[in-house]
Amino acid sequence: MQTPLESTDVKLDTLNEPSAHLIEKNVALPKDIFRSYLSYWIYEIARYTPVMILSLVIGVLVLLIIFFNDNEACVFNSAYYAYLSLVVLLIILGDGNPKLVSRRNFRTELLVDVITRKPAVEGKEWRIITYNMNQYLFNHGQWHTPYYFYSDEDCYRYFLRLVEGVTPKKQTATSIGNSPVTAKPEDAIESASPSSRLNYRNFLLKAAEIERQAQENYWRRRHPNIDALLKKTE
């Protein structure tokens, strides 16, 4: 489970480098625990009460159809309710119950963890963030197992959807990633304790800044001459 955040380390003007001292080792995610995604999926389904109940109902209705096939009314009613149950079951399986991970407190927890750790693109920081989010959902009763996100890639994709369309704070014109992003003192996150009044929009903007900086650093590492290429296009 995630340790309490150190409020003094969470500042809006610290976007430069990932916080290496916050990266924890030996964190096992579902993709490390299960042999395949199928085995993980079966494990999750077997422990999801609504799915188990619907599966049991469908099984009972199918047995009624088999053993009372000479009773047209029984067969018709059983087939009708089995069909409805199957439709609901497929909706649940396809939906993935996103409402459980759309609550503001969970999104805030994810944003604060990203702000604290400043993960790089494809960085190992995402492993501990994913582990923390899985534990958070389970410990707070928002998911039935501590394995909601199968991998760090899944958690990262969820984060990207969260900050999609969010415009980070405007900066002065510079070449890509040459200078750290600074913010006004009043934007600093004074405290990240559960009792504090969290400014969700502030966290969202800050996390979007960090992701933008991480993307720029990623592409600069892959293409060291990117500044020269950009100057040619000006």
Curated annotation (Swiss-Prot):
GO cellular component, one term: membrane
Any one of the GO BP annotations: retrograde vesicle-mediated transport, Golgi to endoplasmic reticulum
Side of membrane Cytoplasmic, spans: 1-47, 94-234
Top-level division of the source organism's lineage: Eukaryota
Membrane topology according to the record: Multi-pass membrane protein
Modified residues (Phosphothreonine): T3
Region of interest called COPI binding, as start-end residue ranges on this chain: 231-234
Major place of residence: endoplasmic reticulum
Keyword terms: Cytoplasmic vesicle, Endoplasmic reticulum, ER-Golgi transport, Golgi apparatus, Membrane, Phosphoprotein, Protein transport, Transmembrane, Transmembrane helix, Transport
Segments passing through the bilayer: 48-68, 73-93
Keyword Cell membrane recorded: no
Xref: InterPro entries: DUP/COS
Residues in compartment: Extracellular: 69-72
Localization per record: Endoplasmic reticulum; Golgi apparatus; Cytoplasmic vesicle, COPI-coated vesicle membrane; Cytoplasmic vesicle, COPII-coated vesicle membrane
The protein's role, per its UniProt record: Involved in protein trafficking vesicle formation, probably by stabilizing of coatomer at the Golgi membrane and thus allowing the efficient formation of COPI coated vesicles.
Similarity comment: Belongs to the DUP/COS family.
Other facts noted in the record for this chain: Members of the DUP240 multigene family are specific to S.cerevisiae sensu strictu. Cells lacking all 10 DUP240 proteins show no obvious alterations in mating, sporulation and cell growth.
Complexes and interactors: Interacts with MST28. Binds to coatomer proteins of COPI and SEC23/SEC24 of COPII coated vesicles.
Protein name as annotated: Multicopy suppressor of SEC21 protein 27
